[in-house]
Amino acid sequence: MKPPILIAILATVMTGTMIVMLSSHWLLIWIGFEMNMLAIIPILMKKFNPRAMEASTKYFLTQATASMLLMMGVTINLLYSGQWMISKVSNPAASTMMTIALTMKLGLSPFHFWVPEVTQGISLSSGMILLTWQKIAPMSVLYQISPSINTDLMTLVALASVLVGGWGGLNQTQLRKIMAYSSIAHMGWMAAIIIYNPTMMFLNLSLYILMTLSTFMLFMLSASTTTLSLSHTWNKIPLIASTILTLMLSLGGLPPLSGFIPKWMIIQELTKNDMIVVPTLMAITALLNLYFYMRLTYSTALTMFPSANNMKMKWQFEHTKKMTLLPPLIITSTMLLPIMPMMSILD
């Protein structure tokens, strides 16, 4: 794809998301979603092959169905309240339909089936956009309608998503599928807290985006798409191998890394709201995620793939690509725990 065309398409994707985030009128929100969806399709099909075509078609059909459900919910709400404003969601049926539409857009369970398939069929750079930027618009709408969301429905969706995100990634060897299931699990944690503390959900989303961006950039730098290709990283870029180890542990939510902050705060907030069973189940299920992150850590940093002696010095002769954004992203993805005391403003 030519650079001017790519810039124009990326600008449209960003504009669509910004329209959704800054609008309080349902029609403008719907227009923003449509702009964003139609502009992302060429990015997903950047590598023009049957697999990318299939992934783009799946993405388009899912998002179009979700947009239709969203407009149906908006129309029902309009009939009952006579208002187009996002703050005036008063009808329970309309609220439920909107919630289902937005969970479908985010890829939360039970509407998660498209996420691993689409992510696996596209390039690493497209997958990075799909699993980070594309989550912002639906989450911002959920944030705005959070007072009217059905608590039981959202809790059930959150628990199912955390379970599916952990269970689905267990036997995967494809890195993009692992990141897709990781995304489903993280979205589940955000869905659990959105009713009780929507601001905390945005903190979680920010940290998730930072960690996922860093991970995808490292995969692109080492040109890895499977756990087997990741095991060659020691020979090519030793520093990257140790960085991937730290990032995986951060994604798993282990202290003293940044990924521990949202899990800690969400469990604390849910406990304050007299919900003991839900955070307990989520914390136990998060061990499944930690297991497959540890598998990646083991294959990347703790084993050396059998190779000839001259291959072990390969890193000395390889010219590595410059990624200026990577160092600050890695630092924020792993070392933010000291700012934890400042988070008291979210209470």
Swiss-Prot record:
Tell me the protein family, please. Belongs to the complex I subunit 2 family.
Q: Main localization of the protein? A: mitochondrion
Instruction: Supply the InterPro entries for this chain.
Output: Complex_I_Subunit_2, NADH_DH_su2_C, NADH_UbQ_OxRdtase_chain2, ND/Mrp_TM
Question: Any idea of its EC number?
Answer: 7.1.1.2
Q: Which reaction does this enzyme catalyse, per its entry?
A: a ubiquinone + NADH + 5 H(+)(in) = a ubiquinol + NAD(+) + 4 H(+)(out)
Transmembrane ranges?
3-23, 25-45, 66-86, 111-131, 149-169, 178-198, 201-221, 237-257, 274-294, 325-345
One MF annotation (Gene Ontology) recorded for this entry: NADH dehydrogenase (ubiquinone) activity
The cross-references to PANTHER family, in alphabetical order and at most eight, read:
NADH-UBIQUINONE OXIDOREDUCTASE CHAIN 2
The subcellular location is: Mitochondrion inner membrane
The protein's job, in short, is: Core subunit of the mitochondrial membrane respiratory chain NADH dehydrogenase (Complex I) which catalyzes electron transfer from NADH through the respiratory chain, using ubiquinone as an electron acceptor. Essential for the catalytic activity and assembly of complex I.
Q: Which organism was this protein described from?
A: Vulpes vulpes (Red fox)
Q: What is this protein called?
A: NADH-ubiquinone oxidoreductase chain 2
User: Subunit comment for this entry?
Assistant: Core subunit of respiratory chain NADH dehydrogenase (Complex I) which is composed of 45 different subunits. Interacts with TMEM242.
Q: How does it sit in the membrane?
A: Multi-pass membrane protein
Disulfide-linked positions: none
The record's Pfam families line, in alphabetical order, gives: NADH_dehy_S2_C (PF06444), Proton_antipo_M (PF00361)
